[in-house]
């Protein structure tokens, strides 16, 4: 993308009906390290690839708990992601104070949509350069909600955002019929296999660069410790990687991938 006379502010439309500032923010999301979210009847899982700036730095946090029944993963500008995660935490706390119960995930998604949309409409603001996946469980079941800087908020069975996320979505599309009845362990393996497909052939997942969050029926949101992550990665290692990152490996639990 190159600078032009229509990208000076978020309120300026191009003759083609585009908001270039919003498109630039979406590109920032696409440059972030990938994250994957999928759900079954009873659980929702988010996994994320953490990056380290160099060999001397720690890996950046990508998954946050926002309430006992929900968590988020982010792709894009991490500083923007932290602001939005804190906003969602505040929304959850306010709802609990007012109504003495956990906020419904759909209400949380609506609040996020309004927050994102305001920065695409008013002069002097810039869109958030981050995409967020919300994983939650409430009386309506498990939820995966995808958001992006354009304020598009969508409920998904499975999705991925960030760099090379199309490879992960290909895996998810081929295995979507297996998710609904999956156990929590199988769901995590599905998510990790999809995340692995976003990596170049010479790289692999490990306990240091992988975050896993899970929430479900009678199970509060939790971030897995490195030792627990390593156990699931050992299961993933039994599934061979396909050439070029294409998602065609056999599904966990013995099921064959769905052909699209």
Curated annotation (Swiss-Prot):
SMART domains: Proteasome_A_N (SM00948). PROSITE patterns: PROTEASOME_ALPHA_1, PROTEASOME_ALPHA_2. Gene3D superfamilies: Glutamine Phosphoribosylpyrophosphate, subunit 1, domain 1. It comes from Caenorhabditis elegans. The gene is pas-6. GO terms for biological process: proteasome-mediated ubiquitin-dependent protein catabolic process. It is found in: Cytoplasm; Nucleus. Pfam families: Proteasome, Proteasome_A_N. PANTHER family: PROTEASOME SUBUNIT ALPHA/BETA. The 26S proteasome consists of a 20S proteasome core and two 19S regulatory subunits. The 20S proteasome core is composed of 28 subunits that are arranged in four stacked rings, resulting in a barrel-shaped structure. The two end rings are each formed by seven alpha subunits, and the two central rings are each formed by seven beta subunits. The catalytic chamber with the active sites is on the inside of the barrel. One of its GO terms (cellular component) is cytoplasm. It comes from the Eukaryota. Keywords: Cytoplasm, Nucleus, Proteasome. Residues 240-260 are annotated as: Disordered. This is Proteasome subunit alpha type-1. Its main location: cytoplasm. Residues 244-260 have a biased composition (Low complexity).
